[in-house]
Amino acid sequence: MTAREEPATTFARRHIGPSSRDIAAMLETVGAKSLAALMNEALPPSIRQAAPLDLGQGLSEGLSETEALAHMQSLAAQNQAFTSLIGQGYSGTILPAVIQRNILENPAWYTAYTPYQPEISQGRLEALFNFQTMICDLTGLDVANASLLDEATAVAEAMALAERASSVKTKAFFVDHEVHPQTLAVLRTRAEPLGWTLVTGDPLRDLDKADVFGAVLQYPGTSGVVRDLRPAISTLKAKGGLAVVAADLLALTLLASPGVLGADIAVGSAQRFGVPMGYGGPHAAYMAVRDTLKRLLPGRIVGLSVDSRGAPAYRLALQTREQHIRREKATSNICTAQVLLAVISSMYAVYHGPEGLAQIARTVHRRTATLAAGLTRLGFAPLNDAAFDTLTVSVGDRQNEIAGRALSQGINLRINADHTLGIALDELTTPEIVEAVWRTFGAAFSYADVEAHAPDLLPADLGRRTAYLTHPVFHAHRSETELLRYMRKLSDRDLALDRAMIPLGSCTMKLNATTEMIPLTWPAFAGLHPFAPCEQAEGYYALFEEFEQWLIDITGYDAISLQPNSGAQGEYAGLLAIRGYHAARGDSHRTVCLIPSSAHGTNPASANMAGMEVVVVACDARGDVDVDDLRAKAAQHADRLAAIMITYPSTHGVFEERIREICDIVHSHGGQVYLDGANMNAQVGLSRPGDYGADVSHLNLHKTFCIPHGGGGPGMGPIGVKAHLASFLPGHPATDGATPPAVGAVSAAPFGSASILTISYIYVLMMGGEGLTRATEVAILNANYVAQRLDPHFPVLYRNVKGRVAHECIIDPRALKAETGVTVDDIAKRLIDYGFHAPTMSFPVPGTLMIEPTESESKAELDRFCDAMIAIRREIAEIEAGRWSVEASPLRHAPHTVHDIADDTWSRPYSRAQGCFPAGTSRLDKYWCPVGRVDNAYGDRNLVCSCPPMEDYAQAAE
């Protein structure tokens, strides 16, 4: 790889919004002589890195987009996308081109944020509602969430739910010996810090002897076996335990649902519904539960409510369950999930409909049955009589020989430890592939000849007898024209980065450049099975190695793990590393975690999951950690102090001056420093956590390193650690050697959502060290510019001793609420009329707005946002002056819709134009919100989380 000869990288100039002329004007506005001078005022000198960011290999200036894509092609060429019949929870699938082009590759979908503002999120909320409906129908359960991270972590979440819901007081959980190995590994990791015991065995034989609060049963099993689980579930429930069934969605189109079998909870992966394997992810997992458990569900739930006119409107329901509300009382830290992938899987079901899904399943099963018949002729009868798509055969000492023959034909089989081979078929399996497998076992058969006499392998008494996907949405869009228009209609309802800036504080909604997204769907990256032989993924390993080194250079840490597939999972993995370190030193009693009151909600939730006791540290009037309170609590808990979790710069939008002192205090009492990297966009190239006292951090690649938010996922949260914690990074059964790791797996795949690492990799590749540093400087400039412009109208709550903010700022309208009744919610909804997504509301300070503009937004867009906020302040002044009451004001009626402007009557004290086209907005390019203000309380009182079946429509018609 060689750098460009030009003095400046073209891509960095395109990524960074303000031009040089804009930067000069903005510096004048904020009263700084230069970017360097502003950085000296915003950052404490004690944390500044001594040398410019050096990424090595001539990458100071980065590559051009053309050169970067050529380099990515060279990496892709080192991968080998063999036909993988490994199974183990991952399947080949066909992503319909219309969905790939119009969702996966469409910035209207992939640049959106989590739909906390429902009025501007109706499109993806409907798509997620469809996902939940699909899951409820296929699993036969009442309520589903809007995705989890992967199947293994979904099972771990189900275990936690079962423990919380069960009346049984034991701390043991039963694990079916047929669960996937990666699931067992993640369960072990999750159970150990909480003091839970795993009991592994055959549920049909061993459950009656087990005293457990719940059990997970794989359906079909990892070996492919299809078992009637009803006796085991009945035994479990008679003893007060909860039944978790980990189910294959495609199999459920032909098999009796978990609900019919008696399950309380169903979990699994939606990967084979159109999402490429991607060497491990990202994929949407799912969880569905009986109605009585709905308030214990982790993650997001989309519900149906009404808007201000009584029209149906979607929203996120039951949010008081979630980690950002429950904090240290949470049993799950799920934050970012896999929304974009859930949308793709739901559209796959819309595309195929129930008949199409069943036909795919029947074809897969028929080819599996035919394969089994041929193997039986060869003397390799499958070990299980009943199967859906996976066979396990005993091959004795011929395992390597047969697997080697398969490899020579470009086919991966699953090599098991007990002299067996696993063969899993999928949507991509052709008769020719089946014939090739037979050849590896020593004979050539004609597929047609064998198929004509092959018996089916599905048990008749487990056949599906209940309907699914009966709602019209799964029947009305069968032509590409109709489906294309449906997806376009939904995307038009939403406001994403392709329309306007999204100034969400602590979320870093920056540009996800098109070039960064291109390699993602290349077959050489998308088509690899995560457990394929390492030699087939040399391009991936080269990417991992180089990207890890870049993160080491950026952070000052000594080792990196790419496994955590969300920021919250990164927190969890980092705390497990600290826990493992203390245990290895004989300090297992160190379980106290100090957390400032301003912390992200995931911090206390992650600490709770890691078996730690949360002790809250106060913040002072400036928003900084109260160092005196920290010192007192560190001393009070010195014998048991495990760690502090601190976000830097703080969630108050300021670089705290005493961060080194904070680290020193914790270290002096035997604790470790976990520095939350959510705000790393303010540090890259300027300061390195590993240099000023932190021991471990996670990095949100979906923030700082340009993976798009996808409407609520995917994300990645790799962790960096200092050398003394390196041996406590997450392990994985697919990559561990003979010696078990000190800390187990936290994700289903060894490198998490590996395929989207290509996005962050190419971003760094094109930005180079200079570009990344410049991006950080401009992000800080943009935040200070917004703070300067808005402060006369909405006071900026926190600044450092030199009057500067970091990369975000908090504005405080609470006095206006006290005087006029205008709430932060009113301001947020009124911003929609101006064409903007609201800033972060009421975090970390209730009643305030936190704004993060990022480096990607131009001065023109920043000015448009500031002008909108100032115009809203003038509207509030009308209320102050008594010309409007707050109830009759455009703020309380916001957002305004086409129904407002088209209404035959208008009795409000402001004009239609004032309401619908407020000052400075364009009538030509107006974003029309599809619904009025959504009634959140109504939605929780009248919870509806899936589409009603067709018989409900028929009954309503009667």
Swiss-Prot record:
Enzyme Commission numbers on file: 1.4.4.2
Cell cycle keyword on record: no
Catalysed reactions listed for this entry: N(6)-[(R)-lipoyl]-L-lysyl-[glycine-cleavage complex H protein] + glycine + H(+) = N(6)-[(R)-S(8)-aminomethyldihydrolipoyl]-L-lysyl-[glycine-cleavage complex H protein] + CO2
A GO term, aspect molecular function: glycine dehydrogenase (decarboxylating) activity
GO cellular component: cytosol; glycine cleavage complex
UniProt keyword Glycosyltransferase, yes or no: no
Cofactor(s) needed for function: pyridoxal 5'-phosphate
InterPro entries hit by this protein: GcvP, GDC-P_C, GDC-P_N, GDC_P, PyrdxlP-dep_Trfase, PyrdxlP-dep_Trfase_major, PyrdxlP-dep_Trfase_small
Keywords: Oxidoreductase, Pyridoxal phosphate
Alphabetized SUPFAM superfamilies for the sequence: PLP-dependent transferases
Catalytic EC class: oxidoreductase
GO biological process: glycine decarboxylation via glycine cleavage system
HAMAP family: GcvP
Protein task: The glycine cleavage system catalyzes the degradation of glycine. The P protein binds the alpha-amino group of glycine through its pyridoxal phosphate cofactor; CO(2) is released and the remaining methylamine moiety is then transferred to the lipoamide cofactor of the H protein.
Protein family (similarity comment): Belongs to the GcvP family.
Complex formation: The glycine cleavage system is composed of four proteins: P, T, L and H.
Protein name (record): Glycine dehydrogenase (decarboxylating)
Organism (species): Nitrobacter hamburgensis (strain DSM 10229 / NCIMB 13809 / X14)
Gene for this chain: gcvP
